[in-house]
Design a protein with these regions (language model features):
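Ferredoxin-reductase
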Residues: 2-81
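FNR/FR-type flavoprotein reductase catalytic core
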Residues: 69-127
Length: 127
């Protein structure tokens, strides 16, 4: 786990109540698909845990639903907003334990980390 500052690069409405947020910053603590981040929001006591959809060396993509005041606050964030983020949380998925043809099942916003898992499985030679 590492605490880092990330900058909102994009915050796009995908559908009613569903958003894609792209954050730029150091993602070196994210080592496996299925991990999550905790985002500190101004005026909120608790951080917001959000699954990582996908990541590169300098950005990460989050897909989230607005289900309360905290995620509503996130949906209004403009590009350039700087966020305090705990990264590299959770165990994630171990792609070395996957079979040759893994089956991924998920639904709603819970399917977001499966995108990153599918990418890593493809890189590992799974079909």
């Amino acid at each position: 786990m590492e605490q880092r500052n990330f900058t909102v690069a994009e915050n796009t409405k995908l559908a009613a109540g569903t958003y894609r947020m792209v954050l730029t910053g150091d993602t070196s603590a994210i080592t496996r698909p299925g991990q999550f981040v905790d985002i500190r929001l101004e005026g909120r006591f608790l951080r917001r845990p959000i699954s990582v959809c996908s990541w590169t060396a300098d950005s990460l993509t989050l897909i989230y639903k607005t289900v309360g005041a905290g995620t509503e606050q996130m949906s209004a964030m403009a590009p350039g907003t700087v966020l305090d983020v705990l990264t590299g949380l959770g165990n994630g998925f171990d792609v070395t334990k996957a079979g040759a043809r893994p089956l991924l099942v998920g639904g709603g916003a819970g399917a977001a980390p499966l995108y990153g898992l599918a990418q890593k499985l493809a890189e590992a030679g799974c079909r």
